[in-house]
C-alpha cells in the first residue's frame, strides 16, 4: 500500500481542459484487484478528483482501463465514469492518453496513438475545477496509500500498479489527435 509517489497538486486546481499521457508496461492479464495508475486526489472523498486505473480483466493482453473524474466548476458539477477495453495493450510498453476539452465538453481516450473512445460530457460540464487536494498519486489509488490521501482506508479489491510507468505528462489543454499520435510515434 505504500508503493506510490506523491507530489503537491496545487498547480492544477483549475485545469479547465487537460491531457494526461503516459507509457505503461503491465503483465497481462490484470487479475487480483484493480491496479491504480494515477490520481489527482481529493482528501474528503473516497475517489479522487481524477483517477485512472486498470480494472480486473482475465483476457490475455486486453486492457480494461477506467477513468473517473469529478468536476466542481459552477454549473458543471458532476461525476463521470468512462471505461474502455483496448486489445493488444498489456505485457509490453503501450501508450495511453485521456483528454478533456472544456470548450466542446468532449473526453477522448487513446491507446497507442489511436482514438479508442470519445464521450460527450456536455458543454455544461465546463472547465474542470478540482477541490480538496492532497497531492498527486502515481502508481496506486488515492485510498491505498500510507498515509491515505482520501477520507477512506485501503480496500482488498484495490492494488498498486504491477508494472512500470514512464513519461507521465500533464497538459493544461486537450491535445489534438495528431499531437497524441506524435507522442506515441516519437515514444514521448
Predicted regions mapped to residue ranges:
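Short surface loop/edge beta-strand patches of beta-sandwich-type extracellular domains
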Residues: 1-18, 80-86
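Glycan-recognition/cleft segments
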Residues: 35-71, 125-128
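Short tryptophan-centered beta-strand motifs in secreted/extracellular beta-sheet-rich domains
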Residues: 92-100, 109
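Solvent-exposed strand-to-loop "edge" motifs in beta-rich extracellular domains
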Residues: 23-29, 40, 55, 98-103
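Short, aromatic/His-centered strand-loop micro-motif at the edge of beta-sheets
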Residues: 68-95
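Extended recognition patches within non-cytosolic domains
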Residues: 164-188
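Flexible glycan-contacting loops in extracellular carbohydrate-active proteins
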Residues: 120-163
Amino acid at each position: 500500500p505504500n508503493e506510490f509517489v506523491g507530489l503537491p497538486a496545487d498547480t492544477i486546481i483549475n485545469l479547465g481542459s487537460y491531457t494526461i499521457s503516459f507509457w505503461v508496461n503491465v503483465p497481462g492479464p490484470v487479475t487480483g484487484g484493480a491496479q491504480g495508475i494515477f490520481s489527482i486526489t481529493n482528501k474528503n472523498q473516497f475517489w479522487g478528483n481524477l483517477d485512472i486505473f486498470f480494472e480486473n480483466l482475465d483476457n490475455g493482453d486486453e486492457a480494461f482501463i477506467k477513468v473517473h473524474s469529478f468536476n466542481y466548476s459552477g454549473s458543471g458539477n458532476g461525476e463521470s465514469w468512462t471505461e474502455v477495453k483496448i486489445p493488444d495493450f498489456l505485457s509490453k510498453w503501450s501508450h495511453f492518453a485521456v483528454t478533456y476539452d472544456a470548450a466542446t465538453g468532449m473526453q477522448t481516450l487513446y491507446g497507442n496513438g489511436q482514438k479508442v473512445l470519445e464521450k460527450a460530457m456536455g458543454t455544461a460540464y465546463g472547465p474542470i475545477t478540482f477541490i480538496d487536494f492532497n497531492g498527486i498519486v502515481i502508481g496506486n489509488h488515492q485510498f491505498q496509500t500510507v498515509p491515505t490521501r482520501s477520507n477512506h482506508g485501503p480496500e482488498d479489491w484495490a492494488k498498486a500498479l504491477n508494472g512500470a510507468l514512464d513519461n507521465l505528462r500533464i497538459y493544461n489543454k486537450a491535445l489534438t489527435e495528431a499531437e497524441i499520435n506524435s507522442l506515441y510515434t516519437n515514444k514521448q
